[in-house]
């Protein structure tokens, strides 16, 4: 293993001024152990840490970097926008341009409101659904993560799952009292709760294809059934495409499974790697937002011109050829991983959602959060470090997606192929 002394020093320094040394928990390597790598630069599919070690990037900033890092068109757009000013607190032309780009890609979306993070997008969509329907209760699914607003942290995935938390201290009973949590991919459970509370439920929110309990795609027809049930009871359907949006296809998950939700949330890819997100949907619903309607939502940096430039440049470069390359790269990577684990005698599942996937250890298919938690997650740290020590940077959690970019090339795949046999043997030798 190459030296990580400087990363270790930087982590210790960060711990003296930042809780846990990181600004998002999964970055601390809490579930896999070892020294978090402090990244100082990235280009294409390669990361470089403070010690000068290079890694093939299979995290892609948790999804946004579909074109790879420092893509020339994105860098040029950001530099040009920054030269004109960083933030104005006033409308800018690029806000409407990015909104139009999203609307053109996702047919049910008629109006867009831009915000700063996926958490803001889902939180605001929930408030809007409640304001539009005049109802209080919301339905979410176990293992689905919709950001860290209080009402949506109950039995969530992502970092909450990684740390083994049922929710979070500080989320009061009152904040979560109107949140109903159901098992994922279970239509009868949804029908039952609507039978009891149908006229009190404002909305159902679900990840369009979950990626925060690992990749656990919806069973065929599940999202369509949610659409049918919510429509029958006058509730709204919110499809959270913060992760899948503009990654798995030009139209996100809607391009794979065209269910016409009332509201969609977006983030990650649409921001080009800078802080931006959005929610949008039917004009009848969106027009209830201030300044047209009574549902308040605002943000000092919403529609930031530099973030808009990054998002526009990314989406405009993400053409059909780019999505074909993403799919080919995901096929190639998943195939290499599967072959190595099979050769090492490790039972595994590699569920896919387009070019997103996860690696679960165990023989049983994973269709919900309970099944994800029942996998042999204790094998993951050994597998993770086997790859990391060989120059491949996978997600540092068993409950997160693996992401590819169009920048992955033969040199990167050669590095991955060389690293996998040892990592697979380490997973095979791991003990609970």
From Swiss-Prot:
Keywords: Cytoplasm, Isomerase, Porphyrin biosynthesis, Pyridoxal phosphate
UniProt-annotated location(s): Cytoplasm
GO biological process: protoporphyrinogen IX biosynthetic process
EC number: 5.4.3.8
Statement: the UniProt record of this protein carries the keyword DNA damage: no
One MF annotation (Gene Ontology) recorded for this entry: pyridoxal phosphate binding
GO cellular component, one term: cytoplasm
Catalytic activity: (S)-4-amino-5-oxopentanoate = 5-aminolevulinate
Top-rank lineage group of the source organism: Bacteria
Cofactor(s), names only, from the UniProt record: pyridoxal 5'-phosphate
Listed pathway(s): Porphyrin-containing compound metabolism; protoporphyrin-IX biosynthesis; 5-aminolevulinate from L-glutamyl-tRNA(Glu): step 2/2
Transmembrane segments: none
Record keyword Cytoplasm present: yes
Cysteines paired by S-S bonds: none
Residue list for modification N6-(pyridoxal phosphate)lysine: 268
Predominant localisation class: cytoplasm
Pfam families to which the protein is assigned, alphabetical: Aminotran_3 (PF00202)
PANTHER family: GLUTAMATE-1-SEMIALDEHYDE 2,1-AMINOMUTASE (PTHR43713), GLUTAMATE-1-SEMIALDEHYDE 2,1-AMINOMUTASE 1, CHLOROPLASTIC-RELATED (PTHR43713:SF3)
Record family assignment: Belongs to the class-III pyridoxal-phosphate-dependent aminotransferase family. HemL subfamily.
Oligomeric and partner information: Homodimer.
Protein name as it appears in the record: Glutamate-1-semialdehyde 2,1-aminomutase
Originating organism: Mycolicibacterium vanbaalenii (strain DSM 7251 / JCM 13017 / BCRC 16820 / KCTC 9966 / NRRL B-24157 / PYR-1)
Lineage, opening ranks: Bacteria, Bacillati, Actinomycetota, Actinomycetes, Mycobacteriales
GN (gene name): hemL
């Amino acid at each position: 293993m190459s030296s990580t002394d400087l990363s270790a020093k930087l982590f210790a320094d960060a711990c003296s001024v930042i809780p846990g040394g990181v600004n998002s928990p999964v970055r601390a390597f809490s579930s896999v152990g070892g020294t978090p790598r402090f990244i100082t630069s990235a280009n294409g599919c390669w990361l470089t840490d403070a010690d000068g070690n290079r890694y093939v990037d299979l995290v892609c900033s948790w999804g946004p970097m579909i074109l790879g890092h420092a893509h020339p068109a994105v860098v040029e757009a950001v530099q040009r926008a920054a030269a004109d000013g960083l933030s104005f607190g006033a409308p800018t032309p690029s806000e409407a341009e990015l909104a139009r780009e999203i609307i053109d890609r996702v047919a049910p979306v008629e109006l867009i409101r831009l915000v700063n993070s996926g958490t803001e997008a889902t939180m605001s969509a929930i408030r809007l659904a409640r304001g539009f329907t005049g109802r209080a209760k919301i339905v979410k699914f176990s293992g689905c993560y919709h950001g860290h607003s209080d009402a949506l942290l109950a039995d969530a995935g992502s970092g909450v799952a990684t740390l083994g938390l049922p929710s979070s201290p500080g989320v009061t009973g009152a904040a979560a009292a109107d949140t109903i949590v159901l098992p994922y991919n279970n239509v009868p459970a949804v029908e039952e709760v609507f039978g009891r509370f149908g006229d009190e439920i404002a909305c159902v929110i679900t990840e369009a294809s979950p990626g925060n309990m690992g990749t656990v795609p919806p069973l065929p027809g599940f999202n369509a059934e949610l659409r049918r049930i919510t429509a029958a009871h006058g509730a709204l359907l919110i499809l959270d495409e913060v992760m899948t949006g503009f990654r798995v296809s030009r139209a996100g998950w809607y391009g794979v499974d065209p269910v016409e939700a009332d509201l969609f949330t977006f983030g990650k890819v649409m921001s080009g790697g800078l802080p931006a997100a959005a929610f949008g949907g039917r004009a009848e619903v969106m027009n209830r937002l201030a300044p047209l309607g009574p549902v308040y939502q605002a943000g000092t940096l919403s529609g930031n011109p530099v973030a808009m430039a990054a998002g526009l440049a990314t989406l405009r470069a993400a053409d059909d050829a780019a999505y074909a390359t993403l799919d080919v790269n995901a096929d190639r990577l998943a195939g290499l991983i599967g072959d190595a684990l099979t050769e090492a005698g490790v039972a595994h599942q590699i569920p896919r959602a387009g070019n997103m996937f996860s690696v679960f250890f165990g023989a049983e298919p994973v269709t919900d959060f309970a099944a994800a938690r029942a996998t042999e997650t204790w094998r993951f740290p050994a597998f993770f470090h086997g790859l990391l020590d060989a120059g491949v940077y996978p997600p540092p959690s068993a409950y997160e997606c693996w992401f590819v970019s169009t920048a992955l090339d033969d040199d990167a795949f050669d590095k991955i192929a060389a690293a996998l046999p040892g990592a697979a043997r380490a997973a095979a030798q791991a003990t609970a």
